[in-house]
Amino acid sequence: MCGRTSCHLPRDVLTRACAYQDRRGQQRLPEWRDPDKYCPSYNKSPQSNSPVLLSRLHFVKDADSSERIIAPMRWGLVPSWFKESDPSKLQFNTTNCRNDTIMEKRSFKVPLGKGRRCVVLADGFYEWQRCQGTNQRQPYFIYFPQIKTEKSGSIGAADSPENWGKVWDNWRLLTMAGIFDCWEPPEGGDVLYSYTIITVDSCKGLSDIHHRMPAILDGEEAVSKWLDFGKVSTQEALKLIHPTENITFHAVSSVVNNSRNNTPECLAPVDLVVRKELKASGSSQRMLQWLATKSPKKEDSKTPQKEESDVPQWSSQFLQKSPLPTKRGTAGLLEQWLKREKEEEPVAKRPYSQ
C-alpha cells in the first residue's frame, strides 16, 4: 500500500522536474491548474493535496492529449456519484486502489473508463515494516535510484531558466500511476478533484517491508502512455501496471510517524544498527545498557572505527537491521541534497513527538 509520501520541491522547481516532450518532439513545461493549492511537504498524508500530472485534454477541449498539466488534488478519491454534502463522510477508504480489483469496484472502474488517469508526483513514499516479536514498526523511505551526472558533479544543476530544456539532473521524482475523479457538491460549489494511487504486489526487493507497493511508472514512455487517454486505450494502459525492481530505500527516523512533522529529518537516512531504538525489559534491558556503555557515544578521530564484525554475535538479536542492504551511493546523494537544502532554507520547526 501507500499511505504517506514526500513532495517538498518548490512549485517552479517541481515544474522543471516535470519537463517533457510533446507528440511533436518539442521540449515543454507542464502548465499549472490551481497552483495556489500546492503545499510542499516532507510528510504528506491522505486528504492532503498533492501534485498530479494529467492530460491537458481533460480541461481544454480539442487540446493535444499528449500535453500535460500539473494540478494539486485531494489524496483519497471521492467518486463523482457520491451524494453526501461532505466528502469526509465517505464510508470506505479510497487512498489506494488494488490493481486486481480495479475493474470490479465502481469507484475506480467508472473514472478509469472515462480516461481519468493521472501520475502522482513525489520525492518518494514511506512504508512501515512490522518488527518481529514487538509492536514497533520501522519506517523506510522508498524512491527511484539517484544518479550523479558528470555534468553536475552532484544531484543538482540546470538552475537557470535557459538550461532547463537541456538537462534536468536534480532529484528524480517518483511517478506513480493513479486515477482521479471530479465530485460536485450536491448543493453547488467548487468541483473537488481527488485521486487514488494504484497498488500492486511488492517487488522482491520490497517484499520484506510490505506485501504491496504503488504501481510505479518507470520512464518517460510509461508516463506518456498512462496519461495519453486520447491515444492509449484503458486495456493498453493497464499493461503498464506491474511491480518494478528499479527502486531503492533506506530506514528513516520515527519522526515521520506523526504526519504533523514536516522537516527534512523525515526522509534522512538512519543507521538501525547504531541507533538501537528498542524496548526491552528485565535481563534484556540490562544487556542493552551494557552494550550502550561499551559503545562510544561519539566517534573519536584517534579511535579506530569498529567494524560490524566486532559486535558480539549474541547481541545481534537486540539490533534491528534493514532486511536488505541500502544502496549507500544513493543514500549519500540524498544526504548531500538535504545538506544543501538545509543551508539554503530557513531552519525548520522542531518536530512534534509521537
UniProtKB/Swiss-Prot annotation:
GO cellular component, one term: replication fork
Similarity comment: family membership: Belongs to the SOS response-associated peptidase family.
Phosphoserine modification, residue list: S160, S295, S322
Enzyme Commission number(s): 4.-.-.-, 3.4.-.-
Extent of Basic and acidic residues compositional bias: 296-309, 337-348
Superkingdom to which the source organism belongs: Eukaryota
Key word GTP-binding present: no
UniProt PTM comment: Ubiquitinated; the covalent HMCES DNA-protein cross-link is ubiquitinated, leading to its degradation by the proteasome.
Subunit structure and binding partners: Interacts (via PIP-box motif) with PCNA.
Residues under site feature: Required for sensing abasic sites: E127
The protein, known as: Abasic site processing protein HMCES
Function recorded in the entry: Sensor of abasic sites in single-stranded DNA (ssDNA) required to preserve genome integrity by promoting error-free repair of abasic sites. Acts as an enzyme that recognizes and binds abasic sites in ssDNA at replication forks and chemically modifies the lesion by forming a covalent cross-link with DNA: forms a stable thiazolidine linkage between a ring-opened abasic site and the alpha-amino and sulfhydryl substituents of its N-terminal catalytic cysteine residue.
Active-site residues, as the UniProt record annotates them: C2, E127
